[in-house]
Amino acid sequence: MLRLNELQLAKELIRFPSVTPVDAGVMSFLEKKLKKLGFKTKILEFKEKNTKPVKNLYARLGNKRPNFCYAGHLDVVPAGNLKDWTVNPFKPSIKNGHLIGRAVSYTHLTLPTIRSV
């Protein structure tokens, strides 16, 4: 089984401007990563009348019990006017030992965090 580099994954996830309902490819990206780690995955698409479809990724590793279920999201709120930012929100950087980028404090980055614990 491959190992996951948590910081690298976090940086890669930040690069996706995944503003709902457009996932900007983040679901497919994460699905490929999880498959390489041995997960069985499935992307489901949900759509209600007069709305754009929204994707969800389900991933499972093994069949043993008890189960651990993680429910999170990979979307972000719109960044607004990029001219108002002091950095590009979708270009991760490290400043003074802190990861800087869009969704750093969101559920968006809990997967790398959970994996590292």
Question: Where are the regions a protein language model picked out?
Answer:
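Acidic/His- and Gly-rich active-site-bordering loop/insert found
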Residues: L2-V104
